C-alpha cells in the first residue's frame, strides 16, 4: 500500500498434478449393519477390486456404498430412480461425513438409460438386488457401465448374507441381456467380467510401441470425426501426466485398458 504496510502475504502454489490419492474417509467411521458390512467384504474379496471407480446400479439406502468405501479405496457413484430413496440415502451419507467426497448418488428418470458415459466402473454392484427389492433397469445398461478388460460386476447375495433377489431371477435378468456371467459358489451371486474392447489399441512405449511407430492401432470404435467422441473422465482420481522437467515429457502409457 502507499503507507508501505504489506497487505498480502507470500503466495504459495500447491501443485496437485501428481496426486492420485482418493479423498480420505472421516477419522471415525462406524461399521454399518452386518448385512452390508459382510456383503462389502465378500464383494471386495471375490472381485479383487479395492480401488478405482465403483458404480452402484440400484443405489438403495446407500449402506452398501458406504461399506465399500469404508473397506477400500474405491470412489463410489450410485444411480437410482426413486426420489424418496435417493433423498434418504443422501441425508444418511451426509451424516456419515462421506457424501460428495467418497460416495454420491444421482437420481435418474430411467435406470435403462443412465446419463453417464460407459466403460467407467472398475467394480459394479447393486444394493437393490442385494436386498431383494428390485432388479433395476436391465443388464445391457449395467454392462455398458463396466470397464472392458478388467471391470467386474458382483450381483446377488454372498454366503452368510440374507437372501435378496432370488438366484433364478438374477440369472434370467442377465440372460435377457445376453450377458456372460459366472455363478459363484455359495450364496446366490454372480460375477460378470467383460472382455477387452474390440479393436482397442495400446501405447506401451514413448513412441507407441517397441518399433517406435507412433501408432497404437486404435480403431476408435469406428469414429471418423470428433463429434462422435465423448469425454470419458474429468476429476479425481487423476492427474496431469506431464512431468515438468527437460524439453520432452514422458508419454502417458496405456495397456490392457489401463
Predicted features along the sequence, with ranges:
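A short glycine-rich, Lys/Arg-flanked "PGG" loop and its adjoining helix->strand segment in the class I
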Residues: 134-152
Amino acid at each position: 500500500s502507499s503507507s508501505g504496510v504489506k497487505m498480502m502475504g507470500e503466495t504459495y502454489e500447491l501443485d496437485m498434478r501428481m496426486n492420485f490419492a482418493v479423498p480420505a474417509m472421516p477419522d471415525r467411521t462406524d461399521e454399518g449393519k452386518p448385512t452390508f458390512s459382510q456383503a462389502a467384504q465378500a464383494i471386495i474379496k471375490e472381485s479383487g477390486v479395492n480401488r478405482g471407480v465403483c458404480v452402484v446400479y440400484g443405489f438403495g439406502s446407500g449402506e452398501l456404498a458406504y461399506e465399500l468405501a469404508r473397506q477400500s479405496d474405491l470412489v463410489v457413484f450410485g444411480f437410482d430412480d426413486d426420489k424418496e430413496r435417493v433423498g434418504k440415502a443422501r441425508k444418511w451419507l451426509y451424516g456419515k461425513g462421506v457424501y460428495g467426497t467418497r460416495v454420491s448418488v444421482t437420481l435418474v428418470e430411467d435406470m435403462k438409460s443412465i446419463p453417464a458415459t460407459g466403460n467407467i466402473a472398475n467394480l459394479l454392484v447393486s444394493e437393490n438386488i442385494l436386498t431383494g427389492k428390485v432388479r433395476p433397469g436391465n443388464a445391457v445398461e449395467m454392462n455398458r457401465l463396466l470397464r472392458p478388460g478388467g471391470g467386474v460386476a458382483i450381483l446377488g447375495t454372498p454366503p452368510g448374507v440374507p437372501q435378496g433377489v432370488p438366484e433364478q431371477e438374477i440369472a434370467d435378468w442377465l440372460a435377457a441381456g445376453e450377458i456372460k456371467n459366472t455363478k459363484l459358489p455359495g450364496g446366490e451371486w454372480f460375477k460378470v467380467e467383460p472382455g477387452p474392447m474390440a479393436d482397442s489399441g495400446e501405447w506401451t512405449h514413448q513412441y507407441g510401441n517397441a518399433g517406435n511407430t507412433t501408432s497404437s492401432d486404435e480403431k476408435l470404435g469406428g469414429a471418423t470425426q470428433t463429434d462422435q467422441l465423448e469425454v470419458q473422465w474429468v476429476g479425481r482420481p487423476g492427474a496431469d501426466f506431464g512431468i515438468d522437467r527437460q524439453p520432452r515429457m514422458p508419454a502417458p502409457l496405456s495397456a490392457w485398458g489401463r
